[in-house]
């Protein structure tokens, strides 16, 4: 078992979390304390699930939950772009990070089935 903080998927998720904390500061008040907080919470939960999956004997269900979380994060990011809370450039950057995490989770899931 690898240390969780050495996993590429953990590192990519942590980088995504940092980026989310940076850009949610720019949200209008209406979105900062609703969608912004939900986005942060979902990303923190994603990182927690990656930790749990790494330390669990049966990883599959936890990885599936993590994949659900990354899709919710993707949805929130798209919503914030459509509501003009983040620029298209920022959305593309965040979406690349989300896609990177998603691909790694999918690969991890395939490796444990």
Predicted regions and their residues:
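Amphipathic alpha-helical assembly/interaction segments
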Residues: 1-113
């Amino acid at each position: 078992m690898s240390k969780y903080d050495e996993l590429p998927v953990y590192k990519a998720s942590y980088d995504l979390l940092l980026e989310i904390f940076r850009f949610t500061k720019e949200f209008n008040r209406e979105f900062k304390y609703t969608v912004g907080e939900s986005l942060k919470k979902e990303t923190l939960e994603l990182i927690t699930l990656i930790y749990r999956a790494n330390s669990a004997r049966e990883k599959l269900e936890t990885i599936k939950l993590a994949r659900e979380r990354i899709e919710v994060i993707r949805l929130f990011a798209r919503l914030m772009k459509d509501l003009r809370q983040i620029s298209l450039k920022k959305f593309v950057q965040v979406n690349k990070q989300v896609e990177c995490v998603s691909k790694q989770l999918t690969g991890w899931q395939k490796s444990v089935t």
